[in-house]
From Swiss-Prot:
One of its GO terms (biological process) is kinetochore assembly. InterPro entries: CENP-X. It is found in: Nucleus; Chromosome, Centromere; Chromosome, Centromere, Kinetochore. The gene is CENPX. GO terms for molecular function: double-stranded DNA binding. GO terms for cellular component: chromatin; FANCM-MHF complex; Fanconi anaemia nuclear complex; inner kinetochore. Belongs to the CENP-X/MHF2 family. The modification N-acetylmethionine is found at M1. The keyword ATP-binding does not apply. This is Centromere protein X.
Length: 79
C-alpha cells in the first residue's frame, strides 16, 4: 500500500509516547507505532477540515488559530 500525503515518522511517534510513559523501560512494537501514527494523521486532518469549515462559517478566507481553538473541544470529545 502506497502512502499519500504527510506521515508521522515512527521515531517521532515513539519519542512522543515515551515522553508520557511513567516507566522508562516501556517498549512499543512497530505495529503499535504505525497505528498511533495513523491515528495522529487522522486527528490532524480532521482538525484541519473542521477548522476550514469553521472559518467558512465565519465568512473568512483563511484559517487562523482562533478557528482551530473553536473546533478542538468537540474534536477531542469525538476522538
Amino acid at each position: 500500500m502506497e502512502e499519500t500525503g504527510a506521515v508521522f515518522r515512527k521515531e517521532l511517534v515513539s519519542k512522543l509516547l515515551h515522553l508520557h510513559f511513567k516507566d522508562k523501560k516501556t517498549k512499543v512494537s512497530g505495529d503499535a507505532l504505525q497505528l498511533v501514527a495513523e491515528l495522529l494523521k487522522i486527528f490532524v486532518v480532521e482538525a484541519a477540515i473542521r477548522s476550514v469549515r469553521q472559518a467558512q462559517a465565519e465568512g473568512l478566507a483563511h484559517v487562523d488559530v482562533e478557528q482551530l481553538e473553536k473546533v478542538l473541544p468537540q474534536l477531542l470529545l469525538d476522538f
